Amino acid sequence: MTCQAFASSDNFVPLNSDSSPSLPLIMHHSAAECLPVSNHATSVVSTVPSVLSLIQTPKCSHLHFAMMTSGNVSAGLHYSVPSCHYGNQTSTYGVMTGIKPATPEMLSASLSQSRILQTCSMPHPNVVNGVSTLQSKSFSFSCSLTPCLYKFPEHALSASSCALGHSFTPMHQTLLSDDPTAADFKQEFRRKSKSVEEPVDMDSPEIRELEKFANEFKLRRIKLGYTQTNVGEALAAVHGSEFSQTTICRFENSQLSFKNACKLKSILSKWLEEAEQVGALYNEKVGVNERKRKRRTTISIAAKEALERHFGEQSKPSSQEIMRMAEGLNLEKEVVRVWFCNRRQREKRVKTSLHQNAFSSIIKEHHECR
């Protein structure tokens, strides 16, 4: 690989690579305008005078790369490079375009590679001696040297060797900070959630009251004759399907959270009051029915024989006769009256059966005679 010189006054600085032979970088500058480049293109200038010389209006600079293989000169790669700004002055760096014009395919390839390499480029700090002095004089130093866009044989490109440093103005801190209103809202939300999630003391009066109510509720529920399933179905019919037998069981065993137990306590206490009122009304109705219905009276054998004798004499005694018999047998008048009624019904059934038997026997004899 060789370098073609354009003039005797031209100066060149080799652009070295770790994995490839050196590629000459030919720049048309005077001695004061020479821009040395390191092997990875990470340094811009090494002295302040050379930087100050860049502020002046430089001559048009060109780069030219050529390769020599087997004694023949290959076609040179020529393309233009975007300009680099130094303050208010402009200086154009690029490959020499006077020998051969760049083809459209080469330009499109260079543009696509430049976009890829620009995204992969790494920021480089200012390494120029005395840059702080220039910055204090309000000089804006922002330079981007266009990298080698074509991959030569045995020449590997890297992000560090194809990009120079960039100087960007840092974003103001107020733009990066969050909205104060949103921050206050977040702090308020965290404070409320923290207060809700704080654990409850197990020895607090609220916990003891919940445990006491759970035990009382269980005893009163059993006394009323309701099961946990009955309570869950009754509550689900009114408040929705969130109540079930499992919920009632966990409440009675104090296995619910403090918040859910407090919510369920008010609902169960109201249901318990209504259930006790319904139970009281039911007991009153049952008591009235029990008073109307008397228990069965047992009559001794001697009393039954005396009543049979009176029934043989008079099957339908009067009220006075029933009273005298009740006083003589030490029975209630209503008991004697009911006994005579039952005895007459039984006598009637016996006579009916006798008549039916007699009639059936007569019919049978009649059929036999035929």
Swiss-Prot record:
Domain POU-specific residue range list: 202-276
DNA-binding region per Swiss-Prot/TrEMBL record: 292-351
InterPro entries (alphabetical): HD, Homeobox_CS, Homeodomain-like_sf, Lambda_DNA-bd_dom_sf, POU, POU_dom, POU_domain_TF
Main location: nucleus
GO cellular component, one term: nucleus
GO terms of molecular function: DNA-binding transcription factor activity, RNA polymerase II-specific; RNA polymerase II cis-regulatory region sequence-specific DNA binding
Entry-linked PROSITE patterns: HOMEOBOX_1, HOMEOBOX_2, POU_1, POU_2, POU_3
Keywords annotated in UniProt: Activator, DNA-binding, Homeobox, Nucleus, Transcription, Transcription regulation
SUPFAM superfamilies for the chain: Homeodomain-like, lambda repressor-like DNA-binding domains
Organ and tissue specificity: Pituitary gland.
UniProt-listed Gene3D superfamilies: Homeodomain-like, lambda repressor-like DNA-binding domains
Motif (9aaTAD): 5-13
Family assignment from sequence similarity: Belongs to the POU transcription factor family. Class-1 subfamily.
Domain notes: The 9aaTAD motif is a transactivation domain present in a large number of yeast and animal transcription factors.
Protein name listed in UniProt: Pituitary-specific positive transcription factor 1
Species whose genome carries this gene: Meleagris gallopavo (Wild turkey)
Chain's gene name: POU1F1
